[in-house]
A protein has these predicted regions:
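Class I SAM-dependent methyltransferase SAM-binding "motif I" and its flanking Rossmann-like core
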Residues: 78-81, 86-151, 193-196
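Short, solvent-exposed amphipathic alpha-helical segments in soluble enzyme
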Residues: 18-22, 41, 88-91, 117-118, ...
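A contiguous loop/helix-start segment that scaffolds small-molecule binding in enzyme catalytic cores
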Residues: 2, 66-71, 127, 135, ...
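Short hydrophobic alpha-helical segments that form membrane-spanning helices or hydrophobic packing faces
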Residues: 15-17, 110-113, 167
Length: 225
């Protein structure tokens, strides 16, 4: 059996009870070393998937399964959001290896807690958009930032803080320039940091803070007073 476990946003206490039990009892653990807090995996035998190909990951899973043992594939946050698990699940189906997915606390939820904000407010917005800028992974034309911004809903942008100036400029095509923005770096980790501003000045503030990755960009009037 292979379990895909969402490890939460970073704080080891955000790992679910079920996820902790599976990790504690696993024979083999595969995780991305740069993304998952090592404290989650104390006293475990692990493979760091950061330098492994999909084929290498599957080979470890096959070997463990052949021995009648259990593999836990640990993903940061929740595996269903930018977790790239579909190709692994499809491959396991072809190999006849049973699997299940255990949800985790996503970084966008930890970010809301860190900011002590609510994404959905009466008379402000009842919609939350989770998205990312296009890069190595393309984005459908209908889901480009300029199109999504037209809703002027709460928007949470993953994997894009390294292009914050371009991001803010593109959002200003639909959001007012004074729309509040908060960038949350490593939500729930000890080094967590929050940078606030507007679509006009957030890029300068984020660059001054030296934040280039591992941060969420949150946009919308939910951040207002």
């Amino acid at each position: 059996m292979v379990y895909f476990v969402g490890a939460g946003a970073g704080d080891p206490e955000l790992l679910t009870v079920k996820g902790k039990r599976l990790i504690d009892n696993a024979d083999t653990i595969i995780y991305a070393g740069s993304l998952v807090n090592p404290a989650v995996l104390e006293d475990c035998q692990v493979y760091d998937s950061a330098g492994m190909t999909l084929e290498e990951v599957l080979a470890v899973m096959q070997e463990t399964e052949a021995q009648g043992k259990t593999t836990v594939r640990v993903h940061t946050g929740d595996a269903s959001i930018y977790g790239a698990i579909r190709e692994q699940l499809d491959a396991l189906d072809k190999l006849g290896i049973p699997h299940t997915v255990v949800p985790g606390v996503s970084s966008f939820l930890a970010a809301a807690a860190a900011m002590q904000k609510e994404y959905t407010l009466p008379d402000v917005t009842q919609t939350v958009i989770l998205t990312r800028m296009e890069g190595r992974t393309p984005v459908p034309e209908r889901e480009r930032l300029e199109e999504l911004a037209k809703h002027r809903a709460t928007m949470i942008i993953f994997l894009s803080v390294g292009r914050i100036a371009e991001l803010a400029e593109r959002l200003r095509t639909a959001y007012p320039a004074a729309t509040p923005v908060a960038v949350v770096y490593k939500a729930s980790w000890p080094e967590e940091k929050i940078v606030t501003g507007t679509l006009l000045d957030i890029a300068e503030k984020v660059q001054a803070a030296g934040i280039t990755k591992t941060a969420l960009v949150t946009v919308g009037e939910f951040l207002g007073d």
